[in-house]
């Protein structure tokens, strides 16, 4: 069965912060580390066979490095996807797990090299496989399903209380 995915996305710094600590990775597109978001709503269409992956990152600052953490995760996903797209076809859950490990390692390595103790990013990701969609999230970036005119949260927050 062939299906297609219509999608739209945007990214905006908001009115409070001078810099944008968010980023995304949408079928190979992501923003540079220093950005003010997108100026438009971007749209696209992908066939299931192309195994599209989409992710959002919400950088956490501490030492004004939230934008770097979000970019590092996006950039890491870009390289991981290119090198491991075959894994997504054969073992999508393993792909998501390994992608998350890879992104986390990139952020941790940078923080260690730069002696930054408080930097990180949350993440929500969806990958479309042959017959199913696979989701994962880290932190409090949420994934919702829209069905029959209603949104319902399908991810679970990972936060300390």
Annotated model-derived regions:
Residues 1-161:
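PP2C/PPM-type serine/threonine phosphatase catalytic domain
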């Amino acid at each position: 069965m062939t299906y297609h995915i219509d999608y739209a996305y945007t990214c905006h710094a908001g009115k409070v912060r001078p810099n944008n600590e968010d980023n995304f990775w949408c079928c190979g597109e992501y923003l540079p580390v220093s950005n003010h978001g997108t100026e438009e709503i971007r749209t696209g269409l992908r066939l299931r066979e192309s195994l599209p992956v989409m992710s959002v990152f919400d950088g956490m600052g501490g030492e004004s490095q939230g934008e770097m953490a979000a970019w590092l995760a996006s950039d890491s996903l870009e390289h991981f996807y290119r090198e491991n797209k075959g894994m997504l076809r054969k073992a999508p859950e393993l792909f998501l797990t390994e992608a998350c490990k890879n992104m986390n390692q990139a952020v941790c390595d940078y923080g260690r090299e730069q002696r930054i103790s408080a930097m990180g990013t949350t993440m929500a990701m969806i990958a479309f496989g042959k017959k199913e969609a696979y989701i994962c999230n880290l932190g409090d970036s949420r994934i919702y399903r829209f069905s029959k005119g209603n949104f319902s949260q399908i991810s679970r927050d990972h936060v300390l209380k």
